[in-house]
């Protein structure tokens, strides 16, 4: 039977089946793809050239720093890095509990993972935990969910990893409980929690770069949930981050029915100063597509679940990410941006972890680490 005859027979069978089911087959015409428009288009409004973007980027960076209240950060103290304990894990890497100064009267604790068999200097990773009281312990694979044991996983892959406590978790849980920011705001009434943790995560990069084992030019950052959007903020803030991966980071400001969660009046308060505006229906002058675009042309991977939170808000995330890609294309670096959308909710499932780690390998290791080879026999 000729291909055209077979196609006609198949079409006839489909037609008879539709008629038998009482349905008339739809008439479908050829069409060109429509232009996709969204509110996220304002990212490049008035921008035609790379030079235009670079000028607009400076405006956005200023707005970002104002959102953080970065001018309220304290003077950075000397690190004075101390090692409190050191153990060898499976003959693969050394795990150290360390502390270092983040303010004149405040020290942060973190776990460091340093591979034992290094050939030359290694890339360094800042691994940020989610909202969990013992976050650095979870990142080290010592408690809770081993899916989130980034320090353990990546140290075995040849990375030097620092997993710091969030500033109201671990060794610095306030008397009121984990993630209570009241005392922080009493100490720094004009600063923001996001400004505080971003500043501290930048100091974690200082720690990595102070180590003989680390190549200071190959620094990455990754995290889940609170650590996910913490990664976005850090990569936008500190250009030493060459590769970033945000897993299930929080929702943005627009198209978010629960936007007040960014400025609660209790417990963990991200941005205290924007609460009056939010209650009046006014959003900050910068949103997440603009913050994420500040990372370009450096490598950025976003992973999210369509069923992680409000369904329509999560679908807006895809439109937002498509617009961020336009910036990477303008920067002639589309290979440095990617996003992965799944249906596994608020998780770091196996395939997500493999994608994150491969992303780091691609952008922080030499090409030989990821190249494929033909079979010779």
PLM regions with names:
Residues 8-18:
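Bacterial N-terminal signal peptides
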Residues 23-70, 369-377:
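N-terminal pre-domain segments of enzymes
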Residues 72-120:
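N-terminal cap/lid segment of alpha/beta-hydrolase-fold proteins
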Residues 120-121, 126-210, 257-258:
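Cap/lid segment of the alpha/beta-hydrolase catalytic domain
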Residues 188, 243-291, 313-321, 329-333:
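Mobile cap/lid helix-loop segments that gate and shape the active-site cleft of serine hydrolases
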Residues 203-275:
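Primarily recognizes the serine-hydrolase "nucleophile elbow" in alpha/beta-hydrolase
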Residues 296-314, 343:
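Conserved strand-to-loop "acid loop" that flanks and positions the catalytic carboxylate
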Residues 322-377:
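C-terminal catalytic histidine-bearing segment of alpha/beta-hydrolase fold enzymes
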């Amino acid at each position: 039977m000729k291909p055209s005859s077979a196609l006609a027979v198949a079409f006839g069978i489909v037609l008879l089946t539709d008629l038998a089911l009482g349905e008339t087959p739809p008439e479908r015409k050829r069409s060109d793809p429509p232009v996709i428009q969204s509110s996220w288009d304002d990212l490049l409004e008035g921008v035609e050239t790379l030079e235009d973007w670079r000028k607009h980027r400076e405006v956005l960076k200023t707005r970002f720093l104002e959102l953080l209240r970065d001018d309220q950060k304290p003077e950075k103290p000397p690190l004075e890095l101390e090692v409190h304990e050191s153990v060898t894990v499976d003959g693969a890497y050394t795990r150290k509990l360390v502390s270092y100064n983040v303010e004149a009267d405040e020290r942060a604790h973190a776990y460091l993972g340093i591979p034992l068999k290094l050939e030359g200097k290694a890339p360094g990773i800042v691994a940020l935990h989610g909202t969990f009281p013992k976050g650095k312990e979870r990142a080290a694979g010592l408690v809770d969910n081993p899916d989130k044991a980034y320090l353990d996983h990546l140290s075995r892959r040849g990375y030097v990893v620092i997993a710091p406590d969030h500033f109201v978790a671990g060794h610095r849980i306030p008397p009121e409980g984990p993630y209570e920011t009241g005392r922080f705001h009493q100490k720094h009434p004009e600063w923001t929690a996001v400004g505080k943790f971003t500043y501290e995560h930048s100091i974690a990069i200082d720690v990595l770069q102070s180590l003989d084992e680390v190549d200071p030019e190959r620094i990455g950052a990754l995290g889940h949930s609170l650590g996910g959007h913490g990664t976005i903020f850090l990569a936008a803030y500190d250009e030493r981050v060459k590769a970033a991966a945000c897993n299930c980071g929080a929702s943005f400001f627009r198209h978010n029915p629960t936007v007040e969660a960014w400025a609660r009046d209790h417990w963990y308060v991200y941005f205290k100063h924007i609460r009056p505006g939010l209650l009046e229906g006014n959003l900050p002058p910068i949103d997440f597509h603009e913050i994420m675009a500040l990372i370009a042309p450096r490598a950025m991977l976003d992973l999210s679940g369509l069923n992680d939170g409000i369904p329509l808000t999560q679908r807006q995330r895809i439109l937002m990410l498509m617009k961020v890609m336009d910036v990477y294309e303008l920067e002639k670096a589309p290979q440095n941006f990617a996003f992965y959308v799944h249906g596994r909710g608020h998780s770091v499932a196996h395939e997500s972890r493999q994608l994150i780690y491969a992303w780091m390998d691609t952008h922080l290791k030499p090409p030989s680490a990821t190249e494929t080879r033909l079979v010779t026999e």
